[in-house]
Amino acid sequence: MNKKKLGIRLLSLLALGGFVLANPVFADQNFARNEKEAKDSAITFIQKSAAIKAGARSAEDIKLDKVNLGGELSGSNMYVYNISTGGFVIVSGDKRSPEILGYSTSGSFDANGKENIASFMESYVEQIKENKKLDTTYAGTAEIKQPVVKSLLDSKGIHYNQGNPYNLLTPVIEKVKPGEQSFVGQHAATGCVATATAQIMKYHNYPNKGLKDYTYTLSSNNPYFNHPKNLFAAISTRQYNWNNILPTYSGRESNVQKMAISELMADVGISVDMDYGPSSGSAGSSRVQRALKENFGYNQSVHQINRSDFSKQDWESQIDKELSQNQPVYYQGVGKVGGHAFVIDGADGRNFYHVNWGWGGVSDGFFRLDALNPSALGTGGGAGGFNGYQSAVVGIKP
């Protein structure tokens, strides 16, 4: 048998054996958005954004600075560009996913050391990988009228963080992992769960008085404390003076004002069984909805909803409903690099939602809640495991 006939026979056997002959590398090349194309996409998006252009005297003033995504996000098939006049644009590196994933008209993007941002971005990575199984470009979804809601927290200047002075009353780190010796004796970070919740409470300036004390024991698996470690918050005795709990802190505030916010943060953290650490903390959204009602006296309308129970359209309708009633939404998910909690407090009416990450305004902007191609969602529009761990706490009002 000559080589030509042998080659034909081998190909036939592969086909009969069920092997896919289409080379996935070639498929990726067909749908890949290279760096030049990504930059062009960002420029086109900026040119259509009056808010971004307003910060520049002319189009020539606008320069793009590519952000290097490190850690879990390296090689993530996304391009992030900070805009010289303020703001950023996040572009997908594959045409089977939405072209623009997120943007901001001010500030800059930075995910380094910010687990909730990195975790959310990592969910984009996983969804883009899922979209690569398709052989069709992203076509979007049918146009659905969505409300435009300006950032509710921005309207009151609310931008909290996780360090000083917000964490002045969190537990003090007692021991550390190798290489973390500098953290010993420092207060733990407030945690993104407490920060997100406290920002919503500041928006409502409620309650004036706490309702119920809370105590719990830190998990014995926590490597930063000697065990057993019991934490207690005398919430029932608290008088929350919202005039002293400021919308944001620069470090120049009075001690009374600093202690006011740190007391709120500590109470919230303890009320949700915060698993404290030197640079982050974790807790579940089910505990947030319980704490708001039982410990802080919020309306019984407060409840948790899970992304896996809704189609994409119905899920976003739930978020839209809350925002239309001027109620910021507590949002949480879980990814490979940990959990992420943040506040959704606005919408641009084009499937982008305004996110306050709880890092003093860093990386705040408009983001898609997912990057899945509708063709990957299947019947009913569910999101499989990609959004299965996302949840929100809604109905938050006094």
From Swiss-Prot:
Its EC number is 3.4.22.10. GO terms for molecular function: cysteine-type endopeptidase activity; toxin activity. Belongs to the peptidase C10 family. This is Streptopain. The active site is at 192 (nucleophile), 340 (proton acceptor). Residues 368-390 are annotated as: C-terminal active site loop. It catalyses: Preferential cleavage with hydrophobic residues at P2, P1 and P1'. The C-terminal active site loop is required for the recognition and recruitment of substrates and release of hydrolyzed products. InterPro entries: Papain-like_cys_pep_sf (IPR038765), Peptidase_C10 (IPR000200), Spi_Prtas-inh (IPR025896), Streptopain_sf (IPR044934). Cysteine protease that acts as a key streptococcal virulence factor by cleaving host proteins involved in immune response. Triggers inflammation by mediating cleavage of host proteins, which can both promote host pathogenesis by triggering sterile inflammation and/or restrict streptococcal infection, depending on host immune statue and infection site. Cleaves host gasdermin-A (GSDMA) in epithelial cells, promoting GSDMA activation and formation of gasdermin pores, triggering pyroptosis. Residues 28-145 form a propeptide. Monomer. A protein binds at residues 282, 339. The mature protease is derived from the precursor sequence by cleavage, either in cis via an autocatalytic mechanism, or in trans by mature SpeB or host proteases (trypsin, plasmin or subtilisin). Maturation can involve a number of protein cleavage intermediates. Mature SpeB probably plays the most important role in protein maturation in physiological conditions. Methylthiolation at Cys-192 of the inactive zymogen form is probably involved in the mechanism of secretion of the proteinase into the culture fluid. GO terms for biological process: proteolysis; symbiont-induced defense-related programmed cell death; symbiont-mediated evasion of host immune response; symbiont-mediated suppression of host autophagy. It is found in: Secreted; Host extracellular space; Host cytoplasm. Synthesized as an inactive zymogen to protect the intracellular components of the bacteria from proteolytic activity during protein production. Once secreted into the extracellular milieu, cleaved into the active protease: maturation can be mediated in cis by autocatalytic cleavage, or in trans by mature SpeB or host proteases. Protease activity is strongly inhibited by zinc and copper, which prevent its maturation into an active protease: inhibition by metal ions may be required to prevent proteolysis of streptococcal proteins. Keywords: Autocatalytic cleavage, Host cytoplasm, Hydrolase, Methylation, Protease, Secreted, Signal, Thiol protease, Toxin, Virulence, Zymogen. One of its GO terms (cellular component) is host cell cytosol. Residues 1-27 form the signal peptide. The modification Cysteine methyl disulfide is found at residue 192.
